[in-house]
Amino acid sequence: NANFLPESIAEMERYLPLPNFVGVKIHSSYSGVSNADPKMQELMAAIAGRARLVKIHSGGPDVPGTLARFAEQYPHLNFIIAHALGSAVTEAARLAQRYPNLYLEFCSSWAGAGKIRAALDLCGVEQLLLGTDMDLIDPAFVIGQYENSGLSEAQLRAIYWDNPRRVLGLDGA
């Protein structure tokens, strides 16, 4: 939380060394601090020195621009764009196409026919991940979106297993 930088740093230092923690999540809507705010820039700098993965919750007109800035400024960090920017999927896919450290996940209560296929066609399967928002949303709903997107078994395996394993740094990937 950018409003509580010292406390956030203390939490990162406490939890990130543990093997079951792989990164941090930023939800600027909850904190009320825009991703473009200088306080968020300070938080991101603190994260960059401690983590390898950041999940940024979608929301707000500043998100695409700040994602591009973060991706350029911190190329060693992997960024997961929560909900693939919601209804701005095309913009999210273009960002993921341009920045190899940006990844999309599509968990949401909005099925948006064709959004996963359209994103894949723009940025490639390597930039897509499975996200479920469990236990807020039944994972079967989200998995159904992937299963009904006309993807091959190899593409589904990449999204469900290979890409997350690589991005999360699991099993030495």
Predicted regions, residues:
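Short, surface-exposed amphipathic charged segments that create phosphate/polyanion-binding patches used
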Residues: 11-15, 96, 119-120, 171-173
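C-terminal active-site rim and adjoining tail of enzyme catalytic domains
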Residues: 131-135, 139
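Alpha-helical elements of Rossmann-like donor-binding domains used by nucleotide-donor carbohydrate transfer enzymes
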Residues: 10-14, 42, 69, 91, ...
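Catalytic pocket-lining loop regions of alpha/beta-barrel enzymes
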Residues: 19-23, 36-129
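Mid-domain alpha/beta scaffold segments of enzyme catalytic cores
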Residues: 1-39, 102, 165
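Catalytic metal-binding/acid-base residues of hydrolase active sites
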Residues: 1-3, 29, 59, 85, ...
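Mid-to-C-terminal alpha-helical segments outside catalytic/metal-binding sites
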Residues: 125-127, 140-173
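A generic structural motif
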Residues: 26-31, 107, 130-132, 157-162
